[in-house]
């Protein structure tokens, strides 16, 4: 195997993550490597979090994010928690400042092992999300799936958490909707020039909701941190919930999201290590570390 890089297979509340240690290297994880890793059942993932040396003063590392289809992602809250857990275990440090495509993110590991990530501030302008046409109020945009007189899903809220999100509000069980069928259509709808993450959200109380997400570039996932943040912000904007909410995800885990008065959104949850190995960032060829072999 050519010059290899260490990696850890992890998950954040079921969101399948590969944390790749690219520090001290000039190369990048290629789309071909991402596709190869995702094609192997053992390393199948939703996002790769590639840790690079810092590019900006005041930050510890630059984190490049790739989806399972090889495309780039701006944000992944669950993946950032995995990065923090891996680095905290290595260094003993508890607080970190990262640079990502979405900007600067601060994160902290708590004494109980949970990790909080400051996901930054949401954006609501139609050009910021972005949308392909003007909407003066993105708390509800004109978009639906199904017949005009009996739509299956309609009138989502739109918000950016550094990446575009559309949240469809439903009263029935979120599992009763064919998100695997509608997700690709909505992700690639012309209204979203950069595609979008699609979430079905059911509010169960002013402090709780259940969500399912079709992730842009990854498909159906067991959890999506930025979608959880977008859902809470959108719910608070439309007076469905307060600004501090627990979310149950398809992976069975719970995320906590708080939209602070300073407009920053804090995502808190757990992260779990599965195994470690090494891989070729160019081809995706990989080997499991002996000590973590099953």
UniProtKB/Swiss-Prot annotation:
It is an enzyme of class 5 (isomerase). Pathway: Amino-acid biosynthesis; L-lysine biosynthesis via DAP pathway; DL-2,6-diaminopimelate from LL-2,6-diaminopimelate: step 1/1. The keyword Lyase does not apply. Keywords: Amino-acid biosynthesis, Cytoplasm, Isomerase, Lysine biosynthesis. The keyword Cytoplasm applies. One of its GO terms (molecular function) is diaminopimelate epimerase activity. It catalyses: (2S,6S)-2,6-diaminopimelate = meso-2,6-diaminopimelate. InterPro entries: DAP_epimerase_AS, DAP_epimerase_DapF. GO terms for cellular component: cytosol. GO terms for biological process: lysine biosynthetic process via diaminopimelate. Its EC number is 5.1.1.7. PROSITE patterns: DAP_EPIMERASE. The active site is at 76 (proton donor), 224 (proton acceptor). It is found in: Cytoplasm. Catalyzes the stereoinversion of LL-2,6-diaminopimelate (L,L-DAP) to meso-diaminopimelate (meso-DAP), a precursor of L-lysine and an essential component of the bacterial peptidoglycan. HAMAP family: DAP_epimerase (MF_00197). Belongs to the diaminopimelate epimerase family. NCBIfam families: DapF. This is Diaminopimelate epimerase. It comes from Mesorhizobium japonicum (strain LMG 29417 / CECT 9101 / MAFF 303099). The gene is dapF.
């Amino acid at each position: 195997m050519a010059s290899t890089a260490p990696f850890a297979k992890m998950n954040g509340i079921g969101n399948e993550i590969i944390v790749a240690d690219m520090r001290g290297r000039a190369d990048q994880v290629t789309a071909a490597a991402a596709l190869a890793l995702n094609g192997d059942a053992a390393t199948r993932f939703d996002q790769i979090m590639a840790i690079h040396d810092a590019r900006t003063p005041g930050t510890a590392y630059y984190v490049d994010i790739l989806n399972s289809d090889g495309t780039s992602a701006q944000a992944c809250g669950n993946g950032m928690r995995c990065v923090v857990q891996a680095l905290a275990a290595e260094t003993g440090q508890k607080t970190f400042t990262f640079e990502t495509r979405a900007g600067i993110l601060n994160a902290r590991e708590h004494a109980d092992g949970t990790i909080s990530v400051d996901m930054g501030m949401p954006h609501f302008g139609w050009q910021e999300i972005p949308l392909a046409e003007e909407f003066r109020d993105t708390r509800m945009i004109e978009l639906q799936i199904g017949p005009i007189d009996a739509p299956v899903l309609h009138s989502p809220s739109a918000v950016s958490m550094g990446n575009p999100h559309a949240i469809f509000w439903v009263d029935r069980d979120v599992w009763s909707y064919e998100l695997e069928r509608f997700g690709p259509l909505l992700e690639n709808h012309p209204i979203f020039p950069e595609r979008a993450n699609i979430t079905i959200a059911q509010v169960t109380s002013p402090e709780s909701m259940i969500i399912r997400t079709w992730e842009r570039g990854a498909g159906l996932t067991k959890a999506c941190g930025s979608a959880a943040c977008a859902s809470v912000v959108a719910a608070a904007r439309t007076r469905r919930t307060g600004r501090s909410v627990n979310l149950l995800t398809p992976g069975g885990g719970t995320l906590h999201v708080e939209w602070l008065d300073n407009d920053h959104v804090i995502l808190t949850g757990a992260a779990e290590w599965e195994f470690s190995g090494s891989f070729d960032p160019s081809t995706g060829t990989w080997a499991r570390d002996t000590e973590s072999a099953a």
